Swiss-Prot record:
Family: Belongs to the universal ribosomal protein uL29 family.
One BP annotation, GO: translation
NCBIfam families from the UniProt entry: L29
Record flagged with keyword Ribonucleoprotein: yes
Organism for this UniProt entry: Thermococcus kodakarensis (strain ATCC BAA-918 / JCM 12380 / KOD1) (Pyrococcus kodakaraensis (strain KOD1))
Protein name: Large ribosomal subunit protein uL29
Keywords: Ribonucleoprotein, Ribosomal protein
HAMAP family, sorted: Ribosomal_uL29
GO molecular function term, any single one: structural constituent of ribosome
Subunit structure: Part of the 50S ribosomal subunit.
Amino acid sequence: MKPSEIREMSIEEIDKKIRELRLELAKERGVLTMGASMENPMVIRNLRRDIARLLTIKREKLREKR
């Protein structure tokens, strides 16, 4: 996700997206733990970065409200 796309979202939408991505990350880690080889090993890295990006922009939005 691009930061510009995230900034257009509301805080509730950001929270929902974070939950979705964390669930997907847990599934991907579960597959990896079971010993299966991943088609694209960058998936976990990209999910973690997207979650971090969402949390950062959420924090920015909350600080603006103060």
